[in-house]
């Protein structure tokens, strides 16, 4: 029988049909090769938006800098970055007037955070520009390298472990005449292989000391490394994103802490909350505007889009905002917070890897590093690249481009949201002093504007006034990309609003399926995703049951673990059939061991091992949960793990799932090829770092783990903890006298070794 598709929607309210419009099947596009071109685009565009500003030269680094602040007022609709200081300060003052005490309270909260934050806060985050090696590294390694270099240069405040003390070292490092660093390098030599008698390249890794003078060090400290943003859908062109070094990160963290604290108190802010909390917060604003406009007023909503939000923002403006927000606070606090925007006003953008050239005739490939772009002959480049390089040349120093205006992506999301909300705040009738008024929502560069007025002319006037007010602080609403609708239907941060936020379940589709971590984690993540979507995204029981069956099928195909009594032949079926036949209670076998699936939508919250534990044969239990199994390298398993799930839109989300350690929780071994490169030394450092942290956690299990505020080192803390624990265990009879004596002896030996060192 043919089904008429329109019949499917007869009973469905229109807004529920949004999940059928899902365009994002398949993989998102990834970037390959160098990001140098995209970075040059960013730098050139940013300067173009501010071109009527004043040029100055940085006295320390010699970098040319463009300052558009208080520049000419715009005369057309082109995007521009000429924010007016007095307008920004006034917007801040009005924001404070309508939220009495907001800045004061947020400053107090932040001050407390500043005094308590440990330096290991900076180990969070993925790739970070490591200034000692002049390339990206995992955050923990970059921090360890920075601290190591600081200490060998006599900067030791960081040893207290507080972030604020590490930042004191950063400030001092900038005053030093020179900094000595250790760099890794690779030596290649050709040798004859004894076995094959062929010539092979042998690589050895060396470390060498290098001195950086003050200027070179400052350039590195102010450098943001750039990469290409991956997995962006709906765009033809890729774009560059930045990753700052350790000198900048700590300062940015404190500024964002302050801004986050302010955003939490602003009803128009879409940050820092997310999910259902965010929807509830925003629905309130809409409700307020609609209730007030029922009788006589019209109400319209703009689904807004800003042109190049962060390329028109300016760190100098953020400095003005911070100066105002912290105006009654202690001097030290104001100084700490003003350093981030000052560093950003003097930032340098690293141009990345450079260009790769190929000669078809001679089969040659050669890399032109970014450092060479300043003086290489441009005849080798095509027209568009030549234009880019010509434009950027005056700004180049040592392979980095001076980039004073603009903010680079994702750096001050919270603070820029505060700026956006301050303009929305000016829409109250007491400020507009006319018949129209506005309110709205702001989340980083995304906004929705709700305008109320007695007639259409009033709405138009309100939108115009909002548009012009934004221009005064360097925000450029795009008239081409924004659209206006009767209030009640709009989109904001990929949430669609129609008489309430609509659950767009299809956005979560990419996160359904098998993650590919290991059999244990994948099963747990798979059912948790389904459970979460039933809770948050209107995934109905029938659809959820179907999703579950599809997931189990997918899982079995991925790990080739079809039921023991199936006809399907895979390379695992021989072993699984044997297991099936010798198992008495077949229901107790995990799905990954060819067992049946016992999940349904009622028990998704129970880890599979727990669900089947009572049904398992005893010897199977013993094999499954055996920490001594030699074939499994065990992670330390917390009771809860975090998985990264990819929705179709927006950033990857972190999702908690239950982790029960079994012999299925294996970790694949590292790829061997890394062990032969200059990365090897770094890898070893990273593993050592990891081991130390794990050991420390063993001594201070999270239940009793209050972060030490004293100045003792990790070793001292562990030794004293070991002594206390041993004494308690000895006195309560849990350990024998000999064991107690042995522990005490080991502790003394460790202390002795430390003294000798």
UniProtKB/Swiss-Prot annotation:
Motif Nuclear localization signal, residue numbers: 187-195, 203-216
InterPro entries assigned: RNA-dir_pol_NSvirus (IPR007099), RNA_pol_PB1_influenza (IPR001407)
Keyword Disulfide bond part of the UniProt annotation: no
Stored Pfam families: Flu_PB1
Catalytic reactions on record: RNA(n) + a ribonucleoside 5'-triphosphate = RNA(n+1) + diphosphate
Presence of the UniProt keyword Phosphoprotein in the record: yes
An individual GO BP term: symbiont-mediated suppression of host mRNA transcription via inhibition of RNA polymerase II activity
Localization, UniProt: Host nucleus; Host cytoplasm
Post-translational modification: Phosphorylated by host PRKCA.
Enzyme class: transferase
An MF annotation (GO) of this entry: RNA binding
Gene Ontology CC annotations of this record: host cell cytoplasm; host cell nucleus
Superkingdom as given in the UniProt entry: Viruses
Biased amino acid composition, Polar residues: 55-64
Subunit and interaction comment: Influenza RNA polymerase is composed of three subunits: PB1, PB2 and PA. Interacts (via N-terminus) with PA (via C-terminus). Interacts (via C-terminus) with PB2 (via N-terminus); this interaction is essential for transcription initiation.
Function: RNA-dependent RNA polymerase which is responsible for replication and transcription of virus RNA segments. The transcription of viral mRNAs occurs by a unique mechanism called cap-snatching. 5' methylated caps of cellular mRNAs are cleaved after 10-13 nucleotides by PA. In turn, these short capped RNAs are used as primers by PB1 for transcription of viral mRNAs. During virus replication, PB1 initiates RNA synthesis and copy vRNA into complementary RNA (cRNA) which in turn serves as a template for the production of more vRNAs.
Protein name per its UniProtKB record: RNA-directed RNA polymerase catalytic subunit
Organism listed in the record: Influenza A virus (strain A/Gull/Maryland/704/1977 H13N6)
Lineage, top ranks: Viruses, Riboviria, Orthornavirae, Negarnaviricota, Polyploviricotina
